[in-house]
Each structure stands twice: as structure tokens, then as C-alpha cells.
A protein has these predicted regions:
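ATP-dependent NMP and nucleoside kinases share a basic, alpha-helical "lid"
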Residues: 66-135
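N-terminal leader/propeptide and maturation segments of large enzyme subunits in energy/redox metabolism
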Residues: 135-143
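Conserved nucleotide-sensing/catalytic segment adjacent to the nucleotide-binding pocket
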Residues: 3-67, 73, 79
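Hydrophobic/aromatic beta-strand patches that form the interior of the parallel beta-sheet core
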Residues: 6-8, 81, 108-110, 182-184
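NTP-dependent small-molecule kinase module
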Residues: 75, 128-129, 145-200
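Conserved protein kinase catalytic core
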Residues: 15-17, 89-90, 119, 193
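Short glycine-/polar-rich loops that comprise or flank the Walker A/P-loop
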Residues: 3, 103-108, 178-181
Length: 200
């Protein structure tokens, strides 16, 4: 049998909120320093070394945190798909001089691109959709936004985008675009409009 395993998102390798808070970087979740890169590299090393069984952390978007009592079991996949905004980045943190990067373990990489105005629109639309659904759950980390009006919701989403997502996009994500083997350009309707393949 041919088995494809998706190791969910690299969010599973974020540090828990407790550690991020202790380091004063909870508001930088999604930036390079918020990931346990060593743990992710160890996982990929084990996969490439032929070890068959792997247990990886699970991230909950509802609780906005790593679930301490939950894990994902990956067993001997023929193809392993690792997805995340950080996976093509190189380590540039002070005091760290890793010569091995996450992307070194990839046989093929894909970057999904879109115009920034479309990304902003999608983010605001998704935030509003979640405000009316998942944010209503009292256990949700974002329950504090549940009673926002439509206009307040849009303003809050745009503020979060401007203060967190936009800097991360421009400083850390976009610069990795041309490190990918394949670039898919999406239009405002989410359909792929162009495909670029890096020639070797």
C-alpha cells in the first residue's frame, strides 16, 4: 500500500503559550523565534533516518496552544507532507548558528502566493466567520471577541493583521518565496492563476 501522511501544520512545533509568555514573545507567535526548531529538526532527522514511528505534538486553534495531553502518531509514510509558513526560513536568531535548516530535509517544496490585498480580505473574512462560530465557544482563546459587532470585528482583524501578520509576511515569509521548487499564484477566488517551477 502507498501511504501519504500529513504532519498537520508546523504549528505543532510552536512552543507552548507558557514558554512564549515567560520569554515575552506570545504576541510574536508564528515568528521564527516562537517555534521549537530543534524539535522539528529532530523529527525530520528521524524520518529521513528511516525510523518508522513518530509522535508529534498537536496544536489547537481553538485553545491557541499546544495540547499537552494530545499527540499525532505517524507511522512509516511513503510521502510526508509538512506544511507551515516557517518551513522555508533559515535560522537568523541571535546566538544561534544552525547550519541545518528545515528545508534541507525536503525533496520538493511548494510556496502558495497571493496578492497582499487578497490575503488581507481573506483574513478579515475568516476572522468574522470565526467570531460568529468558534469564538462563541467559552473555551476558545478568542472568546473575548465573540460579542464584537461586525464593524468592530473587521477593525480588530485589520489591527491584528497590521501589527502581527503583515510584519511576519514581509520580514520572514515573502523572502523565502524563491527558495521553493514550485510557486503557485492564487487569485482572489482561491483558484491558481499561475505556476512557476524553479529550474535546476
Amino acid at each position: 500500500n502507498f501511504f501519504i501522511s500529513i504532519a498537520r501544520r508546523s504549528n505543532g512545533f510552536l512552543y507552548p503559550n507558557k514558554i512564549l509568555s515567560e520569554r515575552g514573545i506570545l504576541n510574536r507567535k508564528g515568528f521564527m523565534e516562537s517555534y521549537d526548531t530543534k524539535k522539528l529538526l529532530n523529527f525530520l532527522t528521524a524520518v529521513k533516518s528511516g525510523i518508522n514511528t513518530h509522535i508529534v505534538p498537536v496544536y489547537s486553534h481553538l485553545e491557541y496552544d499546544i495540547l499537552p495531553d494530545d499527540t499525532l502518531l505517524i507511522q512509516n509514510p511513503d510521502i510526508l507532507i509538512v506544511e507551515g509558513i516557517n518551513v522555508l526560513q533559515v535560522n537568523s536568531q541571535k546566538g544561534q548558528s544552525n547550519k541545518v535548516f528545515v528545508s534541507d530535509f525536503f525533496d520538493f517544496s511548494v510556496y502558495v502566493d497571493a496578492k497582499e490585498e487578497d490575503i488581507i480580505e481573506w483574513y478579515i473574512s475568516r476572522f468574522e466567520s470565526l467570531r460568529a462560530t468558534a469564538f462563541q465557544d467559552p473555551s476558545s482563546y478568542f472568546h473575548k471577541y465573540a460579542n464584537l459587532t461586525l464593524e468592530e470585528s473587521k477593525q480588530m482583524a485589520f489591527q491584528i493583521w497590521t501589527e502581527i501578520n503583515k510584519p511576519n509576511l514581509h520580514n520572514n515569509i515573502l523572502p523565502t518565496k524563491y527558495r521553493a521548487d514550485l510557486i503557485l499564484q492564487k487569485g482572489s477566488n482561491h483558484f491558481v492563476e499561475s505556476v512557476k517551477v524553479r529550474m535546476i
